[in-house]
Design a protein with these regions (language model features):
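Active-/binding-site microenvironments in catalytic and ligand-binding cores
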Residues: 1-200
Length: 200
């Protein structure tokens, strides 16, 4: 790896505040002052939120009882060369992207970090075009063969500009939001000739 002075850094975080949406059914962020300049001489705030608010990294323990938490991940595993792929021109509500879509646009090397620009950051809560339902419930997501491709490539981690790195209809959102699932099912039948259950 190059010297740090040779590396350009990017801040990819979405601003966090009381309006930042949490993962559906999760506790949203709450903030309150417990000290003020007057009379305490300093401001102090208490902030509570669930682990799925704003920009974050899921540790292996999120899906695996024996998995490690984020604090135990080595920073050297998180800092690595990477590539950004722009899929925003093909992005649509409930869209599906594949490993082939990515490899047609960029070269992904073994061990890379992969950042996927779906274009759905424009629906983030802090954007003039904010649309929480599109950002969290209708964003594009990967095909089922994507996970094996990620494993084969030994991708270090994946970043996305929307509510989840997974397709929303390949998560519990499908059960929690039946009207969204019905809309997705209709789209899949029209576009792919398959039902939602056949795709995911």
């Amino acid at each position: 790896m190059s010297k740090w002075s040779d590396i350009k850094m990017y801040d990819l975080t979405i601003p966090i505040g009381i309006c930042t949406p949490a993962w559906p059914t999760y506790e949203p962020l709450q903030m309150k002052f417990f000290k003020r300049l007057t009379p305490n001489g300093a401001n102090g705030q208490l902030m509570t939120h669930s682990n799925h608010v704003g920009t974050h990294l899921d540790g292996p323990m999120h899906f695996d009882t024996a998995g490690r938490d984020v604090a135990s991940l080595e920073l050297t595993k998180l800092c690595a060369p990477g590539v950004v792929v722009d899929l925003s021109d093909q992005a649509e509500d409930f869209g599906i992207y594949t490993p082939q879509d990515i490899e047609r646009r960029v070269t992904v090397k073994e061990g890379d970090v992969l950042i996927i620009n779906t274009g759905y950051h424009i629906y983030g809560w802090d954007s003039p075009t904010a649309d929480e339902r599109r950002y969290m419930l209708r964003h594009p997501g990967p095909s089922l063969d994507f996970i094996q491709w990620v494993r084969d490539k030994k991708i270090r981690w994946i970043g996305v500009d929307c509510g989840s790195a997974d397709h929303p209809m390949n998560t519990k959102i499908r059960d929690w939001e039946p009207m969204e699932a019905t809309a997705c099912d209709k789209l899949f039948q029209k576009k792919y000739g398959k039902t939602l259950n056949e795709v995911y």
